[in-house]
């Protein structure tokens, strides 16, 4: 697995990138083209597997680009949202929840009451 970190800078409409710890570099007229060139440059140094990359602007004229080659897993992203239960009885459940919250708040208030006024 290879990890390639690049520091990217824009000057005069041209983006340049130099590897943070290494000799790889590239330049292009846009960040899109620069990213494509950097991925190809990294692949020429290490072609051991799949490619993941991340481009982050630090300021309007500087950025960090990281290319990860290999590493196995494809980093799946799973976003699960609980579906709301439909049907009758929703009002009763909401009322029960409010009662539980009220009891919890009352017990928290009782826990913090030590019988003296700190600011009085």
UniProtKB/Swiss-Prot annotation:
Name of the protein in question: Large ribosomal subunit protein P3y
Region (Disordered): 81-120
A UniProt-annotated Pfam family: Ribosomal_60s
InterPro entries: Ribosomal_P1/P2, RPP3
Composition skew (Basic and acidic residues), residue ranges: 97-106
Keyword Ribonucleoprotein attached: yes
Keyword Nucleus applies: no
Transmembrane segments: none
Organism domain of life: Eukaryota
Family recorded in the similarity comment: Belongs to the eukaryotic ribosomal protein P1/P2 family.
Sequence ranges of Gly residues compositional bias: 81-92
Single GO molecular function: structural constituent of ribosome
UniProt keyword annotations, A-Z: Ribonucleoprotein, Ribosomal protein
PANTHER family associated with the record: 60S ACIDIC RIBOSOMAL PROTEIN P3-1-RELATED, LARGE RIBOSOMAL SUBUNIT PROTEIN P3Y-RELATED
GO CC aspect terms: cytosolic ribosome; plastid; ribonucleoprotein complex
Signal peptide per UniProt: none
GO biological process, one term: translational elongation
Functional summary from the UniProt entry: Plays an important role in the elongation step of protein synthesis.
